[in-house]
Amino acid sequence: MSKTAGVGRLGGARAADAAQQQQLAAGDAAVARAARPIETLLRAAPLVLCVAAMTLMLRDQQSNEYGTVAYSDLGGFKYLVYANGLCAAYSLASAFYTAVPRPATVSRSWVVFLLDQVFTYLILAAGAAAAELLYLAYNGDKEVTWSEACGVFGSFCRQARISVAITFGAVLCFILLSLLSSYRLFSAYEAPPPSALGSKGVEIAAYPR
């Protein structure tokens, strides 16, 4: 009788654990459904910012008695245009991807995480390069006898400054997306159990001293 009772208690505990896991899964699914519109809007926000920054930079040109200057004359500004275009396309694609309900898997979470990282660093590098160009345009560089240019081409510099500021707004959005995708990836999926590593476990190389 005691053995039968023990088996019954074990079966009841397993059933309770299974029910608890189902409740947790249902709760996670409800949270995911509620958070999907918010994440979709967050992923669409860089699209607006990147298109605005790219448009301003593409139209940035000034002519006066000293000559003509355009964004295409400076490599850093051209890089900013290309980076904003690529990030705008990714923002649109990721917003559509997030808006469509689909089961979350480890592989999909990894893909989204890696793409978020790549485009975050891409737009950050573009903003930093353009900001450095603006600094030189406003202040010059006495060590290499570069004079400042914004005193002559003030309108060009002001429009470029607005474009760079909007780009850093997009950078902030991509940083938030990177944090979100990394949290989803590393909190929802646990490390593989020791049995999945094989009978030998993890082998660590030993180097001679």
Curated annotation (Swiss-Prot):
Species for this entry: Zea mays (Maize)
Subunit structure: Homodimer and heterodimers.
Pfam families documented for this protein: CASP_dom
Stretches in topological domain Cytoplasmic: 1-37, 101-109, 183-209
Main localization category: membrane
Keyword Transmembrane included in the entry's annotation: yes
Identification of the protein by name: CASP-like protein 2A2
Stated family: Belongs to the Casparian strip membrane proteins (CASP) family.
Keyword annotations from UniProtKB, A to Z: Cell membrane, Membrane, Transmembrane, Transmembrane helix
InterPro entries: CASP/CASPL (IPR006459), CASP_dom (IPR006702)
Assigned GO CC terms: plasma membrane
Ranges per topology, Extracellular: 59-79, 131-161
Compartments where located: Cell membrane
Bilayer disposition of the protein: Multi-pass membrane protein
Transmembrane segments: 38-58, 80-100, 110-130, 162-182
